[in-house]
Amino acid sequence: ISPDFILSFNYTDTYCRVYGDNNTEYDYIHGKAELDKNVETCNIVLGIDEYLDDDVKDIDLDFLTFKKYYQRIYKSTGNKYLDWVDEIKEGYAEYVRKMNDALAAKPVQMQKNDLYFPWQRSYTDPSSIKCPQHTLYIFGHSLDSTDKDILKLFICNDNVQTKIFYHRENQDDKKSLGKLIKNLVQIMGQEELIRRTGGAHKTIEFI
């Protein structure tokens, strides 16, 4: 694996030190542990997910400071990952636009000096239009709903293939797999999970 981007939910730079190179861009979304920082100056995020319903979550702010999204903003951990998400979504939107234009352009046979031109010059064969594909590798993350807002932005894209690695004692051990599936239901809902784990729209693979 030679990743272009790494979104770290960890507080250390272990991956960067052991496997990293200068061509990889990192985003420590939960902050980074550094020896010269203390409890007052560190930017480490320790919090909970949004547990309130949509109609009250922006009104009931009693426990706002404990929520992860608040701490990310307050501690300035950054949001480079949003640029990566935009790149994924914009690439797919451009692909859909080109496909719609190609399908809407009806081929017309033209005649000139007894020579036949089978297609208009502006016609684009839909089969020649390629959708930009991305692969998301997930290592060592429980997919807990506390990170739902971020994980969903990446996983729920039709041009993203998600490969989730999980620990097992042997080939038949599915204890961790069961927990991951349960957490994914909380992230995207059962219908979306079913669609993405089988059939023509499969985008999620457990490894």
Label every PLM stretch briefly.
Residues 72-127, 145-146:
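A Trp-anchored, charged/polar loop motif used as the substrate-binding/catalytic surface
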Residues 53, 64-66, 90, 104-105, ...:
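A generic signature of intrinsically disordered, low-complexity regions enriched in glycine/proline
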Residues 1-90:
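Extended, H/D-rich, highly charged conserved domains that either
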Residues 22-23, 100, 112-207:
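SIR2/sirtuin-family catalytic core signature
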